[in-house]
């Protein structure tokens, strides 16, 4: 069997089923990698919680809602760590302008629960905070309220409070019941967010106008401007993005997703749920799409073009974009050919990016890992990896150090929590969750990512510190 127990895991042998070495001789689907389970005690995980999954991923990118976190101050602060991850524009679907640009990045409200609130209950405090927040920000179109571990344990009824406040305030007040302990990873929060939005919002409003070429772009969160790249491609093809779920989206867009002609699911781990629900109830079909890397981007633009009879327009976009990026792609391939890379993403990016990085940059993908991926995602990683690649579910800190020692990656695509850990080991790291200098999606986005990888590897600082092969001046070529 191709499962592997790393040396550091001798005292937690259960980890063996979470670590897989690709072997093409094994029958396809024969080895089911263990995943989406509670982290084993003693394993220093890098995972986020269910609350992070709903607020930090699903709803954090919406431009015109106010977020109220029912928690002690720590969870509220944690819930506001979106930084540049989800930029928004003030323009609204009806032509009006939202009064605060990047409102979602600037404001969050918490109930600041204390010991007394835990003992006697915090529902009255929550009502008071919602009323005060509504007066402070009267222009928001909805208020989203979040449970956390503390309020989940004491049993505060967020649904009842939100129902009462919605009637009082005359705007949608929606409860998201995903306290941190609700699931093994942030993936549970994705699930709760999808179902809450579908059950409470989808089908409750009508769009200002519709066309025969309307799509929902689902699971696209506009990380560092990703959505705006795809929006331009679709615009050039004559296709209208009616609703986003949820990058640069408005509350209203979530309410009229049922009016689209087709849904495209970009992040297949966090948002396939709502696409399935919309198809089942409203008959809107969906396609799973991948826009990372030139080949996948072209392939999926063609699929969308074929669905709407826009094949010629799709080919024109592909040709124009490839002509733009080819010279830079050739340069970065010449500099990155053969260099070892570890892709350590939360979920789908680990399998989205492995083949394009090998195909267009000539890099050697030696390791793949995920923090909250499910079985179908690991099957895709296994399918796209070459023999000998190590694939890890929920890697802990000691495992990461051992993988660096044994597989010698020259760069890691990972998250902010791991970035400086790898730096201490002398390995450059580029953030793949919120990006360094994005966007990373689409044709030009792939070049942006290649540039950041190149700059990180050839940064002269590594040579000055006695690590790597950075050469002064190389990063400025």
Curated annotation (Swiss-Prot):
Similarity section: Belongs to the NifD/NifK/NifE/NifN family.
Cysteines paired by S-S bonds: none
Protein name as annotated: Nitrogenase molybdenum-iron protein alpha chain
Positions with a binding annotation for [8Fe-7S] cluster: 49, 75, 149
BP GO terms, sorted: nitrogen fixation
Keyword set includes ATP-binding: yes
UniProt keyword terms in alphabetical order: ATP-binding, Iron, Iron-sulfur, Metal-binding, Molybdenum, Nitrogen fixation, Nucleotide-binding, Oxidoreductase
InterPro entries attached to this UniProt entry: Nase/OxRdtase_comp1 (IPR000510), Nase_asu (IPR005974), Nase_comp1_asu (IPR010143), Nase_comp1_CS (IPR000318)
SUBUNIT field: Tetramer of two alpha and two beta chains. Forms complex with the iron protein (nitrogenase component 2).
Function: This molybdenum-iron protein is part of the nitrogenase complex that catalyzes the key enzymatic reactions in nitrogen fixation.
Single GO term (MF): ATP binding
The protein's Enzyme Commission number: 1.18.6.1
Cofactor-binding details, from the entry: Binds 1 [8Fe-7S] cluster per heterodimer.
Pfam family, one: Oxidored_nitro
Superkingdom of the source species: Archaea
């Amino acid at each position: 069997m191709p499962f592997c127990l790393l040396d550091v895991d001798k005292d937690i042998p259960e980890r063996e089923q979470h670590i897989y070495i690709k072997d093409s001789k094994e029958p396809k689907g024969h080895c089911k990698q263990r995943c989406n389970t509670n982290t084993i005690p003693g394993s220093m995980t890098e995972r986020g919680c269910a609350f992070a999954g709903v607020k930090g991923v699903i709803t954090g990118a919406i431009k015109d809602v106010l977020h109220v976190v029912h928690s002690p101050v720590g969870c509220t602060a944690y819930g506001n760590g979106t930084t540049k991850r989800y930029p928004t524009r003030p323009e609204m679907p009806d032509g009006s302008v939202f009064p605060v640009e990047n409102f979602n990045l600037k404001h969050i409200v918490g109930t600041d629960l204390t010991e007394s609130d835990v003992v006697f209950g915090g529902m009255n405090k929550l009502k008071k905070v919602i009323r005060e927040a509504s007066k402070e920000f009267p222009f928001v179109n909805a208020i989203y309220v979040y449970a956390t571990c503390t309020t989940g344990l004491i049993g505060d009824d967020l649904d009842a409070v939100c129902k009462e406040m919605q009637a009082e305030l005359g705007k949608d007040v929606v409860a998201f019941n995903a306290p941190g302990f609700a699931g093994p990873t942030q993936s549970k929060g994705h699930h709760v967010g999808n179902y809450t939005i579908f059950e409470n919002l989808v089908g409750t409003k009508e769009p200002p106008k519709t066309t025969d070429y309307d799509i929902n772009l689902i699971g696209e969160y506009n990380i560092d401007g990703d959505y705006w790249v795809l929006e331009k491609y679709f615009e050039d093809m004559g296709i209208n993005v009616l609703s986003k779920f949820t990058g640069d989206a408005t509350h209203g867009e979530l309410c009229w997703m049922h009016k689209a002609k087709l849904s495209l699911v970009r992040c297949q781990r966090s948002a396939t749920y709502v696409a399935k629900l919309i198809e089942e109830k409203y008959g809107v079909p969906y396609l799973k799409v991948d826009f990372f890397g030139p080949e996948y981007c072209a392939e999926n633009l063609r699929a969308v073009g074929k669905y709407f009879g826009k094949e010629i327009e799709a080919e024109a976009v592909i040709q124009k974009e490839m002509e733009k990026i080819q010279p830079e792609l050739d340069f970065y391939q010449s500099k990155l050919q053969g260099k070892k890379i570890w892709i350590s993403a939360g979920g789908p990016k680990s399998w989205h990016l492995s083949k394009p990085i090998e195909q267009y940059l000539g890099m050697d993908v030696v390791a793949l890992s995920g923090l909250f991926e499910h079985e179908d995602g690991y099957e895709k990683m296994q399918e796209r990896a070459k023999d000998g690649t190590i694939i890890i579910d929920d890697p802990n800190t000691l495992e990461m150090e051992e993988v660096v020692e044994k597989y010698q990656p020259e760069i890691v695509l990972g998250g902010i929590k791991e970035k400086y850990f790898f730096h201490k080991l002398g390995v450059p790291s580029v953030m793949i969750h919120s990006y360094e200098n994005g966007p990373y999606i689409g044709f030009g986005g792939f070049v942006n990512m290649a540039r950041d990888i190149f700059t990180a590897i050839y940064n002269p600082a590594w040579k000055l510190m006695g690590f790597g092969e950075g050469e002064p001046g190389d990063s400025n070529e």
